[in-house]
């Protein structure tokens, strides 16, 4: 049978994190990241087959070159795990802001790209970088299915009293000023995993999840749906970070 290989990309303003999954076994075939895109001292770091960290320094002027570098490492004789990068049959992208347009992950087409561009006012550092990753993969493997996974999507189930601010209603209608929340993919995963470990049904629990990374947020989840979260219009709100 075919072994499906899926690449997951998280493109930031000057970084790209990547993982390659074997979807048959669920295992991670390769993982790493690029830092300092367009800056002096740019490098790619990866975890090799023995779990050792390897750093390769190289000039990386932009995201396109960064993704080309990642694909060349994936097919490299020493560090690689695939013979040809065309073995990758789908790509998932973290997209930070889906606004009110997206309540789930979606297959990317031109309409989706246009909507992500519209949401760029709300995430000017992240959304344009996320799209650079999409365009780079399309240029390298034309026609490859690409999926956008939104940080905000999980929180679209919040009731209006949780997402509305105490501001003139026109600001919401005209400019989309409301609580959106972030880290949704993480909160959804953590809440489901907690229920798995506890052996309880996900659909009838009340759960508080905490995402603690460089940024931090907490979410209230009732019956499998996000009902409130600490981040707001932007990721700056909420917990001290």
Predicted regions and their residues:
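Short, small-residue-biased leader/transition segments that mark boundaries at the very start
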Residues: 1-4
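Short glycine-aspartate micro-motif
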Residues: 6-8, 90-92, 147, 207-211
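Short beta-strand-loop/turn "lid" adjacent to the catalytic site in phosphate-handling enzymes
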Residues: 74, 78-126, 147, 153-162
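Short glycine-rich, Thr/Ser-proximal phosphate-binding strand/loop in the N-terminal lobe
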Residues: 15-61
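A structured beta-alpha segment of the ubiquitous adenosine-cofactor-binding alpha/beta core
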Residues: 52-84
């Amino acid at each position: 049978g075919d072994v499906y290989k899926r690449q997951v990309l998280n493109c930031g303003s000057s970084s790209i994190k990547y993982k390659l999954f074997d979807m048959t076994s669920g295992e991670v075939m390769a993982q790493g990241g690029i830092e300092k895109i367009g800056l002096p001292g740019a490098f790619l770091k990866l975890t090799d087959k023995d779990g050792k960290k390897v750093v390769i320094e190289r000039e990386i002027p932009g995201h396109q070159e960064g993704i080309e570098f990642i694909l060349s490492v994936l097919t490299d004789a020493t560090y690689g795990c695939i013979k040809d990068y065309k073995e990758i049959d789908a790509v998932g992208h973290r997209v930070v802001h889906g606004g009110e347009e997206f309540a789930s992950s979606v297959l990317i087409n031109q309409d989706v790209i246009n909507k992500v561009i519209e949401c760029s006012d709300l995430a000017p550092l992240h959304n344009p970088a996320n799209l650079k990753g999409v365009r780079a993969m399309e240029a390298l493997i034309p026609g490859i299915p690409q999926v956008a996974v939104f940080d905000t999507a999980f929180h679209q189930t919040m009731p209006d009293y949780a997402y509305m601010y105490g501001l003139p209603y026109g600001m919401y209608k005209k400019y989309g000023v409301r609580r959106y929340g972030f880290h949704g993919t993480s909160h959804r995963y953590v809440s489901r995993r907690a229920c798995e470990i506890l052996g309880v049904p996900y659909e009838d629990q009340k759960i508080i999840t905490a995402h603690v990374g460089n940024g931090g947020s907490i979410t209230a989840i009732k019956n499998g749906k996000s009902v409130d979260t600490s981040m707001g219009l932007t990721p700056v709100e909420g917990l001290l970070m």
